[in-house]
Amino acid sequence: MEHHHLLLQLSPPPPPPPLPAAHLMMSPSFFDAGVFADVGGDWMEDLMHLGELFGVGVGGDDDDNGGVDGGVGGGDDRMQEWQNNCEGAGSPDHQPSCGDGDGDGDGDVSPRDGELGDGDGDNSATRKRRDRSKTIVSERKRRVRMKEKLYELRALVPNITKMDKASIIADAVVYVKDLQAHARKLKEEVAALEEARPIRPPPPSAAAQRPQRQPRRVAAAAAQLARAADAAAVTTAAAAPHGARVAHVGAAQVGEGRFFVTVECEPAAAAARGGGGGVAAPVCAAVESLSCFTVESSTVGCSPDRVVATLTLKVSEAEEDVSAISECTVKLWVMAALLKEGFRPQPTVQIS
């Protein structure tokens, strides 16, 4: 910048035609001897000062013109070399900066090229940082998942010696091997027990035994009913003062070993005038006489012409096979008990 100021001080009064700055500085008109002669003798001092700045010597006093020409010529060559170093081979848009360059065209690049280069570098650096961030995030997620799995494994294994990852995995491996060995041992014991157990024929099921027992019970109840009917036929009216007739006997199974029994009787004329109260007691006494049943509940409803008794019977615990007692067997047993108490069967009695 100091060189430019010194050159501008030596410019002639009439301004030259407009030219680029580089051509203006190197124009020969600046070193015209006639022009300097008009200015005065101060131009020699200025020229010598420029020669010292550019390393150019000025001629002696014997040959002023030759010295001036030689000095100017040497200065012109040095100026040309300096201009070439400053201008370079590129266009003004890509002109390198002057000053610290060493004359080989390797000076600082222009701001535009620098900006482009910095942009490319920034993009590459940003891309690298983004890839590195993705890698770090993925690795962090993988470690979090691994840590969660290790926590779950530590909760399942009962004997954990240490809390570090290697100890947790080693203890889990030992625990799984122990479980496998225990399972093999149990299988061997089961196989040995199966071989030592004697083979026995399966016992007959209750369903298979029921058809054999039930006919015998039904036959026994029928025989008992026949005997009770024969005894009732020879009984006199004095032996049965109520003189009631059995109109209907019904039974329904309401659970295992439990039956719902209904008895309908038609009282005689004397018992009907008394409201049927003399028939309810013999009905309950007849049912209670059955030793294989227990009366859980009973209800008696009386009307002038009919007495209806409803009872809930449960098979006693003394009976071995409760499933062998059917509804038909219960009806026959209740009917036989009523006949023993002096009830007379109607010709159209219903047993259902």
From Swiss-Prot:
- List where in the cell it is found: Nucleus
Question: What UniProt keywords are attached to this protein's entry?
Answer: DNA-binding, Nucleus, Stress response, Transcription, Transcription regulation
Q: Is Calcium a UniProt keyword of this protein?
A: no
Tell me the domain of life.
Answer: Eukaryota
Question: Annotated region Helix-loop-helix motif: where?
Answer: 144-179
Which GO BP terms sit in this record? Answer: regulation of DNA-templated transcription
**GO CC term (a single one):** nucleus
Disruption outcome: No visible phenotype under normal growth conditions, but mutant plants exhibit impaired growth, leaf chlorosis and reduced iron concentration in shoots, when grown under iron deficiency conditions.
Where is region (Basic motif) located? 130-143
Region Disordered, residue ranges: 59-141, 194-216
Tissue and organ distribution: Expressed in the meristematic zone of lateral and primary roots.
Where does the UniProt entry say this protein principally localizes? Answer: nucleus
Where are the annotated coiled coils located?
Answer: none
InterPro entries per the UniProt record, alphabetical = bHLH_dom, HLH_DNA-bd_sf, TF_AMS/ICE1/BHLH6-like
Ranges of Low complexity composition bias in the record: 206-216
What triggers expression?
A: Strongly induced by iron deficiency in roots, but not in shoots.
Q: Write down a Pfam family by its short name.
A: HLH
Q: Where is the bHLH domain?
A: 130-179
Molecular function per GO: DNA-binding transcription factor activity; protein dimerization activity; sequence-specific DNA binding
Subunit record text: Forms homodimers. Interacts with IRO2 in the nucleus.
The entry assigns this protein to a family as follows: Belongs to the bHLH protein family.
**Function of the protein:** Transcription factor involved in positive regulation of genes involved in strategy II iron acquisition, including genes for mugineic acid (MA) family phytosiderophores biosynthesis, and genes involved in S-adenosylmethionine cycle and iron transport. May play a role in the regulation of iron deficiency response by promoting the nuclear localization of IRO2. Possesses transactivation activity in yeast.
Q: Which PANTHER family match?
A: TRANSCRIPTION FACTOR FER-LIKE IRON DEFICIENCY-INDUCED TRANSCRIPTION FACTOR, TRANSCRIPTION FACTOR SCREAM2-RELATED
Name of the featured protein = Transcription factor BHLH156
| Annotated gene | BHLH156
